């Protein structure tokens, strides 16, 4: 049944994940300046309305930095998990840069090392060490 559903929809992957932000420029400074992402798109599509996408270098999935709809929260647990080559090294770098990170990298049996961090709006993101 799963194969039939995939064939019926034409879905081929994840293109963009949206994160609620209160200030585009501050968010760009964090994601590009601190995390080292590249800015892929920054356009004004209506007066006072911007569409901004950032991504890790070489990634196919982007992150849309978008204002939260009225009444929707900012500072949420996004569930977004980024891959990293070294959770320990990135944890130390981000902590030294003043980023709100967990006190320690998690090391659970059978699970890749990981930790969470918060962006300037309080959105929780995760960095998970990849073996590939």
Model-assigned labels for residue ranges:
Residues 57-62, 71-73, 87-89:
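Short, charged/polar surface micro-motifs in flexible loops or helix N-caps
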Residues 30, 88-93:
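Short amphipathic alpha-helices within nucleic acid-binding modules
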Residues 51, 81, 114-116:
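Short hydrophobic/aromatic beta-strand element in the GNAT-like acyltransferase core
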Residues 9-12, 18-61:
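Core segments of cupin and vicinal oxygen chelate
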Residues 1-10, 16-19, 42-43, 91-132:
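Vicinal oxygen chelate
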Residues 48, 76, 111:
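Exposed loop/turn and edge beta-strand positions of beta-sandwich/beta-sheet ligand-binding modules
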Residues 14-16, 75-80:
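Eukaryotic phosphotyrosine signaling hubs
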Residues 18-20, 55, 81-85, 128:
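Short hydrophobic/aromatic beta-strand micro-patches
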């Amino acid at each position: 049944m799963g194969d039939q559903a995939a064939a019926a929809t034409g879905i081929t992957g994840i293109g963009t994940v949206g994160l609620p932000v209160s200030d585009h420029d501050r968010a760009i400074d964090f994601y590009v300046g601190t995390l080292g992402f590249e800015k892929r798109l920054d356009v004004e599509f209506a007066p006072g309305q911007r569409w901004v996408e950032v991504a890790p270098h070489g990634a196919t999935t982007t992150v849309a930095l978008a204002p939260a709809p009225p009444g929707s929260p900012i500072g949420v647990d996004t569930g977004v998990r980024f891959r990293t080559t070294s959770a320990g090294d990135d944890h130390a770098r981000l902590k030294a840069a003043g980023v709100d990170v967990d006190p320690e990298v998690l090391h659970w049996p059978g699970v890749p090392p990981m930790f969470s961090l918060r962006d300037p709006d309080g959105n929780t993101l995760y960095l998970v060490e990849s073996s590939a």
